[in-house]
From Swiss-Prot:
Chief subcellular location: cytoplasm
Marked site: Stabilizes the basic form of H active site to accept a proton: D91
Subunit record text: Monomer.
Keyword vocabulary terms for this entry: Cytoplasm, Hydrolase, RNA-binding, tRNA-binding
GO cellular component, one term: cytoplasm
Protein name per the record: Peptidyl-tRNA hydrolase
Binding-site positions, tRNA: F15, Y64, N66, N112
Length: 188
């Protein structure tokens, strides 16, 4: 099974290391680990490579989070991918920092990036990898997800990226349930 991994985030250096950009962070880790470089397309950056006979495409939308769904007509056409190849990597404030959750389907909840994707695709039946960023009720949700990780939190997030960069490239139609068990039971 070919795999289209789309990490959500906001473009621009001012969003680097913010909670909302963990999807971008994981894509950057995968690019670095596999000695790739991102190429720019109309409204996204991408890298593609093969593992054995499987094609892996890594995507960072450049549309800002709330418009992430706008890239899919272009991406599916360019890379000959379908919704069953899709894995979206996204932050989740309902999960503690360092916890991850892999799902085959799901709703958008309060996440505008997922809502945009689901509306664009006309479906919620696509894979999601949620990366827990914690929550702090002292902040408005928007302010919290746009806040940067402190140094100790950033160490934990990098440990999550290291772990996930080993796990997610092996996801296929035969291993998805096993990967769910492995990823969902991890915590950093």
């Amino acid at each position: 099974m070919n795999l289209l991994i789309v990490g959500l985030g906001n473009p621009g250096s001012n969003f680097l290391h913010t909670r909302h950009n963990v999807g971008f962070g994981l894509i950057d880790k995968l690019v670095m680990k596999n000695a790739l470089s991102l190429r720019k397309a109309k409204n996204y950056e991408y890298a593609d490579f093969n593992i054995d006979s499987r094609r892996i495409v890594l995507i960072k939308p450049l549309t800002y989070m709330n418009l992430s769904g706008n890239i899919f007509p272009f991406v599916f056409s360019k890379f000959y991918m379908k919704i069953n190849n899709l894995l979206v990597v996204v932050d989740n404030v309902d999960l503690p920092l360092g916890k991850c959750r892999l799902r085959k389907v799901g709703g958008a909840s309060t996440h505008n990036g997922l809502r945009s994707i689901s509306e664009s695709l006309g479906s919620t039946k696509y894979g999601r990898l949620y990366i827990g960023v914690g929550n702090n009720s002292a902040f408005a949700l928007k302010d919290f997800v746009l806040s940067k990780f402190n140094d100790s939190e950033l160490v934990r997030v990098k440990n999550v990226f290291n772990f996930l960069s080993e796990e997610i490239l092996g996801i296929d139609e035969f291993s998805f349930e096993h990967k769910i068990a492995t990823i969902n039971s991890s915590s950093f």
